[in-house]
A protein has these predicted regions:
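C-terminal motif of bacterial Sec signal peptides marking the signal peptidase cleavage site
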Residues: 15-19
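Conserved functional micro-motifs across diverse proteins
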Residues: 20-196
Length: 196
């Protein structure tokens, strides 16, 4: 009886440990971002690289944290038209392969009315900018964006920033969708619904 109880305890422990594995992330080409917790956020396969949205939200230039995301903008870039606001998508990109690969440069947001937004590219002085990492060349083997031990990786979102000027009306035309296109083959794409 003691052996049966011990065996039952081991089986229960093994089942509990397997439930704790990171199966909450699924590799897909379409998915729904699961909100601020990142729980169940999809790993988006785009060519050889894997993209994961960490957070997406409106940005307030008057907020201290958000102001740091808006550094490195020219006066023309900083100007919002009436009915526009800042929107940020924070993501991580992983190269799990043994060779370098180019990260995507076409990452757009679209709404249900087919409005399409392209990211604003800040100067390299913006330490959170996705482009700071992605435009510097291929992503090394076994590397990630943002690189470890950088301001972006150690920041509150732990992701590299894609910065958009978005029409406020698009926030009503949800869901917003992030669309990622492989830089070498435009037929390879992935998309994720964004949290607002």
């Amino acid at each position: 009886l003691a052996r049966l109880l011990s065996l039952a305890a081991l089986v229960a422990l093994a089942a509990g440990l397997s439930a704790c594995s990171d199966d909450s992330h699924t590799r897909v080409t379409t998915g729904t971002y699961a909100g601020e917790s990142g729980q169940n956020a999809p790993y988006l396969n785009v060519g050889p690289l894997i993209y994961e949205v960490q957070l997406s939200r409106q940005l307030n230039p008057a907020d201290t944290e958000d102001a740091s995301y808006l550094t490195g903008l020219t006066p023309a870039q900083r100007r919002l038209r009436p009915g526009e606001e800042w929107f940020g998508v924070f993501l991580q990109v992983y190269n799990e392969s043994s060779t370098p690969h180019l990260p995507a440069k076409e990452l757009t947001i679209s709404d249900t009315q087919h409005n399409v937004y392209i990211p604003v590219v800040p100067q390299p002085t913006n330490e959170f900018s996705y482009q700071r990492f992605a435009y510097s060349g291929p992503l090394a083997a076994k590397a990630r964006i943002p690189a470890l031990n950088t301001v972006a990786a150690n920041g509150p979102t732990q992701g590299a920033l894609l910065l958009y000027k978005i029409k406020i009306v698009s926030l009503d035309n949800r869901p917003l969708e992030l669309n990622i296109i492989d830089p070498l083959d435009a037929s390879i794409t992935a998309s994720a619904e964004l949290d607002v």
